Amino acid sequence: CEGTEQLQQNTGGKSVKKGKILALLLAGVMATTVLGGCGSKGSDSSSSSSKASSDEKVLNFGCAMYTDGSVNTAGDENGGWNAMRYGITETLFKFNDNMELEPWLAESYTVNDDHTEWVVTLKKGLKFSDGCDLTASKVKEAYEHLKEVGPSGSAKPEKYLEFEATIDADDEAGTLTIKTSQPYANLMGQLSHPTMGIVDVEHTENFDNGTIGTGPYMIDSFNGVGVGYTLVANPNFREEVPYDKVNLLYMGDNSAKAMALESGQVDLVENITNVADIQKFQDSDDYTVDIATGVRCGFSWMNFDGVLGNKTLRQAILMAIDYDTICNSKTIGGLYTPGFSVLP
């Protein structure tokens, strides 16, 4: 599986804000949503609420751009990943670093013996960044929006929750009852996919660049394709938000991100996959490198032509390969771990 790296520049160990951002990103908590009070419409234009001040805590974050930076969870699969990665959306449940399911917006759930009826209890007192309460009806509305819009895009939400499922919301009890036509071994796990992030559908005007969610940051402005976003702290978030403002800057390749970090243009970058750059940062006390195992797999392919057209020879080569040595070679640099098949 492919590793994910986050790099930050240290300043003599004195910067509190830079010490917090890595944990924030690894937890998938860095959220972005839009505008003020409940009932106001989402926007991608600058908000007057984010005035710079001398004591403002600002993070400059260099990252890759996917699908023109869209945060539309229903329209594009990358949109869901962007929204959660930037911190716009959260899901009912999430997977921790050990790939164990744990509550996020939900408090708990129960399921019947047939695994066709799930009752989810929401945490109390949660709000969207526009001030609206997170209710069972709001969650139902978000899922119905995915059902309505999903077929016209690439997000394919039906992979995680069938369109035949019925959803009943009880706002007084704070519960959501989901009934499916077929058994789901782990529906809560599937609802943890970024595509299933909970959005305030009613008050979001611009789903592509102004989605309203429940996380610690909200979109102050979308600065353009290839440029990035300006994010500000969500005043309605349930916990303390480490930064007042995050400048999310799109950077085209690994080298650009590495150079931006070295020059001080940014404080944090992600997914540096050049082994030489990673080693350079790891060897310096000025930077912190955090590497976590991802869920993406890489493959090496054999040419079936010529000598390797012999199946027995290919099998012999596969049996002789030392996968640990390859994964830890100078070329791979430990960014991959040896995989295996569930089949014998």
Language-model segment annotations:
Residues 1-59, 100, 145, 166:
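Short, low-complexity disordered leader/linker segments with a strong preference
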Residues 55-65, 117-120, 139-142, 176-178, ...:
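Short, well-ordered beta-strand elements
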Residues 62-111, 212-213:
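N-terminal lobe/hinge region of extracytoplasmic solute-binding protein
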Residues 107-152, 308-309:
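Aromatic- and charge-enriched surface segment that lines or borders ligand/interaction sites
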Residues 110, 114, 155-201:
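Surface-exposed binding/hinge segments that line
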Residues 189-241, 245:
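Gly/Pro-rich hinge or "lid" segments in bacterial periplasmic/extracellular proteins
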Residues 234-279:
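Ligand-site clamp/hinge motif
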Residues 236, 270-344:
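Local pocket/hinge segments that shape ligand/substrate recognition
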